[in-house]
Amino acid sequence: MDYKRKSNEQIGGAQASEDRRTVVLDIETVALDPSNEKGALDAMTGRAVCISMLADDGKAAKEITLAGEDEARIIAGFWDALRPGDVVVGHNVLDFDIRFLQQRSWILGIQPNRTLDTRKYYTADVIDTLQLWTNWSGNKKGVTLDALGSALGCGRKTGEGANVAQWWAEHDIDSIKRYCQDDVRLAYRVFCRLTYQEPRQLALNEGQLFTTSVMEPTVNRVAEVRLT
């Protein structure tokens, strides 16, 4: 059997489509109260400061990174970036990233332009590499993105999430963006390994980046990056 022919469409249980993209997601959050570090993990006590996506349309991959002080704009930008056929991918994305964004959307009064089906064992809308690895067993201890990336030969994380709060306090948005983008690239490589695919090269000039501390979005040139 040629295992490399298996694709995320097969794993997700849906047919391939020109409109269907794999959108790898990672978010960074901070506590509303800086003295409560664990508050960053709960949508009632934390907020999103960066959302990074890597969209693979079967031909090329491009990055979209939304970061800054205007959380409502960041989250609305995430929902607007999703297309109807997109499959959202990430590590622990079901229990954290998507849940957090949905809950913050309720709090901020943002209506998503689509509903992601996050039912257990259902992978047409969302594929979680953590659940893929553990086969929904609930035995998640030690299965971090860093550990899984290392075990699969995909690389390791380039920083620590604990640094995000400090960067935020120092208004160092660029460091938060770089850290979030590096995580999303690692998650993409892990997903490709688990689904027997080759990571695509990041498309030149296709990365959209805006920081909400400025009035208008700016599109930045993205250097050609080999994701393998």
Regions found by a protein language model. Name each.
Residues 2-81:
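Conserved RNase H-like, two-metal-ion catalytic cores of nucleic-acid enzymes
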Residues 4, 35, 40-45, 112-115, ...:
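Aromatic-residue detector
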Residues 208-228:
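Conserved "right-hand" nucleotidyltransferase catalytic core of DNA-directed polymerases
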